[in-house]
């Protein structure tokens, strides 16, 4: 079978689903889920590498890759929110940010804009650096991987009747929880930061059109 970026993305989502399904089913299942989490993040890098090196990058493939990212993010953060390890507002934030940016990207594509070149939705260098550069995508993937794996290890080591560390001292537990909070909210902050260029450029693209439509409606409404 010939592997394509889209097939790798589909495999990544399946691996993510299996990882989340394993969490909460005992220490060794939790550890296996952590390994699968690393594999899912690695597959994210692999589909991008295939697209670039094999010249398989397409607008549809880019949208499928983004869809895979959203599914992975929402699956993991929703699970950890349900079991009380992160704030419920965290998956809400990721979902809202993803819905807003994906909506604007869809409008931009429909209006004839692309993700690159002279007709790109993000013409400013700082927007491309935050959203599309390799360092930004790599850092974001690393933050998510560290966040998901840390929470998974915490689940395996300190929670459940067969936790590897059993009952830990309150000071140790507080330290573990503090690190988890720093990791999760740092990931959320970088997620919002990467979404800002899309929101700003989307507003610049479509706000004038919305004003024009409203202006055309006003005389008709007055009549």
Label for each model-derived stretch:
Residues 39-40, 61, 93:
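Active-site alpha-helix of zinc metalloproteases
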Residues 44, 65:
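Conserved G/P- and acidic residue-centered "switch" motifs that form tight phosphate/ATP-binding loops
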Residues 57-62, 68-69:
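Aspartate-rich (DDxxD/NDxxD/DxxxD) Mg2+/diphosphate-binding motifs
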Residues 19-30:
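Short, hydrophobic transmembrane alpha-helix segments
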Residues 1-9, 13-16, 35, 66-223:
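A feature for the membrane-embedded catalytic helix bundles of lipid/isoprenoid biosynthetic enzymes
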Residues 30-38:
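Structural signature of hydrophobic alpha-helical transmembrane segments
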Residues 17, 39-42:
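A generic "structured core" feature
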């Amino acid at each position: 079978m010939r592997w394509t970026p889209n097939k790798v993305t589909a495999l990544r989502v399946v691996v993510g689903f299996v990882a989340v399904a394993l969490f909460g089913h005992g220490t060794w299942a939790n550890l296996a889920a952590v390994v699968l989490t690393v594999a899912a993040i690695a597959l994210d890098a692999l589909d991008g590498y295939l697209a670039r090196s094999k010249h398989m990058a397409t607008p549809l493939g880019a949208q499928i890759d983004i869809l895979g990212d959203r599914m992975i993010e929402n699956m993991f953060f929703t699970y950890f929110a349900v079991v009380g390890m992160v704030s419920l507002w965290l998956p809400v934030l990721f979902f809202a940010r993803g819905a807003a940016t994906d909506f604007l990207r869809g409008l931009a594509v429909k209006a004839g804009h692309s993700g690159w070149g002279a007709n790109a939705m993000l013409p400013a260098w700082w927007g491309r650096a935050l959203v599309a550069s390799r360092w930004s995508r790599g850092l974001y993937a690393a933050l998510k991987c560290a966040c998901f794996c840390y929470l998974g290890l915490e689940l395996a080591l300190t929670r459940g009747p067969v936790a590897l560390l059993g009952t830990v001292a309150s000071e140790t537990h507080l330290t573990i929880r503090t690190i988890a909070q720093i990791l999760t909210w740092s990931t959320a902050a970088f997620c919002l930061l990467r979404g800002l260029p899309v929101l700003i450029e989307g507003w610049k693209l479509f706000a004038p059109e919305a004003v024009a439509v409203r202006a055309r409606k006003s005389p008709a409404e007055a009549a």
